[in-house]
């Protein structure tokens, strides 16, 4: 396949709505043919890693990311395993034992995150605590997905941080993607950069940051609905008369103008 084709496929996959990768894959195969399968699967693999998609590994959700990728496999230091991935079906394969050193602070973060997710995130929620090569640094990832295709919407929350214990610094991003597609096609994305200093308890700080982010989102939704959208609506006179829709719409001035292209 040409480089241009590869780029187009990657861009389409990159913009795929949360929870709809298999549908996008089938559509691309229909359009581009079976010969494009390898290119599409490679793009899906990049998508899964970039979005820290949870993979089903023997019935457990395990996040994959750039932080726990080792060669062609991924490691889960918390559960002590390493595995390959079927990226299309998001399944773990060839599971093997894996040992990693997890210090006391990281163990505390694992416990605290488990409690935080169980009381604050709906749907399918999981997290990862990943020791990095620099011993003072730990990657913390939270992913919550809620897919409801029967009601035409899917949602994906990802927050990703790196905590430097020596510097007391927490940096990362919070990302939300929602797709609503009943009688329309609306895709919502919100992202926030995080950079905090003098942090001693990373999970406590994450709770505060994410609670504030959620509050700000709610306020922006309220403002959008009650102010911005209302200003877009055209004010029409109230006639208190029932409009006869259908062919009779041509009897009204608005209908005649529309029919005549005015």
Swiss-Prot record:
MF terms in GO: actin filament binding
Domain of life: Eukaryota
Protein family (similarity comment): Belongs to the F-actin-capping protein alpha subunit family.
Keywords of this entry: Actin capping, Actin-binding
GO CC terms in record: actin cortical patch; cellular bud tip; F-actin capping protein complex; incipient cellular bud site; mitotic actomyosin contractile ring
Native source organism of the sequence: Candida glabrata (strain ATCC 2001 / BCRC 20586 / JCM 3761 / NBRC 0622 / NRRL Y-65 / CBS 138)
InterPro entries attached to this UniProt entry: CapZ_alpha (IPR002189), CapZ_alpha/beta (IPR037282), CapZ_alpha/beta_2 (IPR042276), CapZ_alpha_1 (IPR042489), F-actin_cap_asu_CS (IPR017865)
Cysteine disulfide partners in this protein: none
Gene3D superfamilies (UniProt xref): F-actin capping protein, alpha subunit, F-actin capping protein, beta subunit
Name the record gives this protein: F-actin-capping protein subunit alpha
Transcription recorded as keyword: no
GO biological process: actin cytoskeleton organization; barbed-end actin filament capping
Protein task: F-actin-capping proteins bind in a Ca(2+)-independent manner to the fast growing ends of actin filaments (barbed end) thereby blocking the exchange of subunits at these ends. Unlike other capping proteins (such as gelsolin and severin), these proteins do not sever actin filaments.
Quaternary data: Heterodimer of an alpha and a beta subunit.
């Amino acid at each position: 396949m040409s480089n241009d084709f590869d780029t187009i496929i990657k861009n389409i996959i990159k913009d795929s709505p949360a929870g709809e990768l298999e549908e996008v894959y089938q559509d691309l195969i229909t359009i581009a043919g079976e010969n494009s399968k390898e290119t599409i699967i490679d793009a899906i693999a990049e998508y899964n890693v970039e979005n820290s998609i949870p993979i089903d590994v023997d019935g457990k959700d395990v996040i994959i990311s750039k932080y726990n990728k080792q060669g062609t496999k991924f490691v889960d230091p918390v559960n002590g395993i390493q595995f390959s991935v079927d990226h299309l079906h998001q399944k773990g394969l060839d599971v093997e034992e894996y040992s990693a050193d997890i210090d006391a602070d990281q163990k505390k973060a694992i416990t605290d995150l488990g409690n935080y997710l169980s009381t604050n995130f709906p749907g399918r929620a999981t997290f990862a605590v990943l020791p990095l090569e620099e011993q003072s640094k730990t990657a913390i990832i939270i992913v919550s997905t809620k897919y409801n295709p029967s009601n035409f919407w899917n949602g994906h929350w990802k927050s990703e941080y790196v905590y430097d214990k020596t510097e007391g610094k927490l940096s990362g991003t919070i990302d939300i993607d929602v797709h609503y597609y009943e009688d329309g096609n609306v895709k919502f994305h919100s992202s926030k950069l995080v950079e905090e200093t003098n942090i001693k308890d990373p999970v406590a700080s994450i709770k505060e940051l994410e609670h504030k982010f959620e509050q700000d989102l709610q306020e922006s939704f309220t403002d959008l609905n009650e102010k911005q959208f209302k200003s877009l609506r055209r004010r029409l006179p109230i006639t208190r008369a029932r409009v006869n829709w259908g062919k009779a719409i041509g009897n009204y001035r608005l209908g005649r103008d529309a029919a005549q292209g005015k």
